[in-house]
Amino acid sequence: YPIRAPRVGCYGDMMGKAGVRTYGFRSPQETYDVYCYVDHLDGDVFHLTAPSKFTFEEAAKECENQDARLATVGELQAAWRNGFDQCDYGWLSDASVRHPVTVARAQCGGGLLGVRTLYRFENQTGFPPPDSRFDAYCFKRRMSDLSVIGHPIDSESKEDEPCSEETDPVHDLMAEILPEFPDIIEIDLYHSEENEEEEEECANATDVTTTPSVQYINGKHLVTTVPKDPEAASGTISTNFPQTMEPAKLWSRQEVNPERQEIESETTSEEQIQEEKSFESPQNSPATEQTIFDSQTFTETELKTTGYSVLTTKKTYSDDKEMEEEGTSLANMSTPVPDANGVESFTTLPEATEKSHFFLATALVTESIPAEHVVTDSPIKEEESTKHFPKGMRPTIQELDTELLFSGLGSGEEVLPTLPTKSVNFTEVEQIRNTFYPHTSQVESTSSDKLEDFNRMENVAKEVGPLGSQTDIFEGNESVTSTTLIEILSDPGAEGPTVAPLPFFANIGHPQNQTLRWAEEIQTSKLEPSEEDGKPELLEETEASPTEFIAVEGTEILQDFQNKTDGQVSGEAIKMFPTIKTPEAGTVITTANEIKLEGATQWPHSTSASATYGIEAGVMPWLSPQTSERPTLSSSPEINPETQAALIRGQDSTVAASEQQVTARILDTNDQATVSPVEFNTEVATPPFSLLETSNETDFLIGINEESVEGTAIYLPGPDRCKMNPCLNGGTCYPTETSYVCTCVPGYSGDQCELDFDECHSNPCRNGATCADGFNTFRCLCLPSYVGALCEQDIETCDYGWHKFQGQCYKYFAHRRTWDAAERECRLQGAHLTSILSHEEQMFVNRVGHDYQWIGLNDKMF
């Protein structure tokens, strides 16, 4: 309801301000008045009376006798605006009793103008009883406004086509919308079996379900037919994801030299890209995993389990002295990141002493519960060289060229058999989880020249942990392993691969035979070579009590230095499989990552390293031993309680890691060789981020006990940006996904409520009071006869027939006279002609009288 003079009972929700009040959304059963709008009057409203007046029914009949009807409230209001004035109450069509007042008279509405209403009760509720007697207001339409209203002729009966009118409103609606909205994808719903019987009886009806549905996807016209039989629909090509919350797509590109052109992937052809149809998550049918193997040895392996872990190895061969590494893009669904084509990282390595062949083995590990079998295989590039040190490694991120994408939900995930794709679809993700995978470059030489010897699994070091780098060097076996750990953050609703660097700081220390336990575990152990070359081993894992499912992987590296003279290290294998752990009561649920070096002598030694790595920034120290004896190196991460890194939004275009120093001491039982410290500086191009030394962002902290050698990975939740309440001057902080919003108290503005503005700008004072602004406050200087904080209370009233406005009393005289007579009349009343001093006073005078009025000669019109 509108209000101009707030008073008791008329405050509403405007806190004493003039305006339109509201009670909010109310129940339809509640009763209130109604506000109507009338534009113009298309007829005449006239007044009827009789000596004995009329009841409501008599008034309606009397209007009918006049070829009219009872007027509505809107029609009477429009007539009043046109100057209709009648100081007699009369019936209206809604059984209310009203009369219009155009000329203010004391005996007619108390001197007020408008349409006056007669109520039954003092609280202005209820209309008079219908048997009460009043005059009547009738309405008669003008003849020129009459219009001919034609009635539609009933159509002929269509009994011969009883089902012709039965159509699917969804299809009719989509048929109208699709030509105008080419980006809408239509989803057809099957009719139930009950409707099929009715459709058979309708020979003339159109079968909507068999009509090809036209789809428009990015402007391309696709026609697909939705089968009528639900069983036929289930025969479409689909991939089932049992116990999977987030299906991940894997796509890769293989690069081989001319000698190995026969190595092909069965899932990288363009034709098979078109074969990808749909995903059916709820069902638990076995899914087929197409694993890339050598075409001469392996074709395809079907994993016989509903949920399984897959180790997929991407291979890249080259004949030159530099290592080629496939670019990998990671999907960070929580933060938009610009194009990552220009993000590169360089690692300078010592020159190779002899020409050698290298290949990159990137292992992708996904977990699903329960797990029974794992098939792993990796070919080995044979070469007669005895020492292998790659010159340099230059990983480059290429957009959608070679990409490896997965996520690490603990409940399990699958890898789609169709590799090439250009989009990433994520289903429901309840919270952000973390998965780490390594980029591993492996250099190995064997004594055979045959390329078909695939009886040994390459040593692919797999670590799961915070973003960091660990370099294990085994001079004796000439096997160099480098690992770069990268974190993936997933967020629902985002698409496409993006890149985001994440920080990690750690000190590395390793006493003898210690075991490091992480929040996610990878186990690598020996894969026993069978007599039949080229056949992978199946590693069994027994299910445990499914009290709580935790994706656990373990790592175990077996070293055998007995074949030192052969120029290689045998007995190295990898097995990766998830396990199920049942947590005990009262214990913290942690999983373990066991890394043990057996067959070699180890000495307690600690080194320290602190580095920050981003996506594809595999920067690592390359330690060149000074002796040809068999050295061993063991290390484990150790917490650095003084350093935490936060990754927040900023304008800096680069993140430069501080100069770091890694000292590694390689000892042997016969000869102790010391590797000189290696100093390196890392610079990672990350345009939308900056690195600050703070503890506000999510970090991974690793607590290490030197004696028990057991660490726990603690996942710290996101920061509460409103914890310190950055809002000033009493503002309220509300956190958002990326920042916070301050809601300021009256009188302040700005992002942090730091600006003090004029509180009197909104004119909070009432009844013509003057507002005085202060520091975070204001004060109202009231006119005479008004009190209150906002001068809203009137303590004095005017005489009968006078109207009060802003402390002054006004009286309207309807009869016309000259200016001199008007001035004398005002003097006789102890007043003077009105002086219009404000726009509000002008509006008040216009409301009091609808005719022209004399005012003071020295005044101007507002």
From Swiss-Prot:
Which residues of this chain are annotated as glycosylation sites? 123, 204, 332, 407, 425, 477, 513, 563, 696
Task: Report biased composition (Acidic residues) as residue ranges.
Answer: 264-273
Q: Name one Pfam family in it.
A: Lectin_C
Cite a GO CC annotation. Answer: interphotoreceptor matrix
Q: Which SUPFAM superfamilies match?
A: C-type lectin-like (SSF56436), EGF/Laminin (SSF57196)
Q: Where is the EGF-like domain?
A: 718-754, 756-792
From the UniProt record, give one GO term of the biological process aspect.
positive regulation of neuroblast proliferation
Spell out the residue ranges making up region: Glucosaminoglycan attachment domain, similar to chondroitin sulfate attachment site in collagen type IX.
234-525
Q: Which family does it belong to?
A: Belongs to the aggrecan/versican proteoglycan family.
Q: What is the annotated quaternary arrangement, including any partners?
A: Interacts with FBLN1.
Q: This chain belongs to which protein, by name?
A: Versican core protein
Q: Which gene specifies this protein's sequence?
A: VCAN
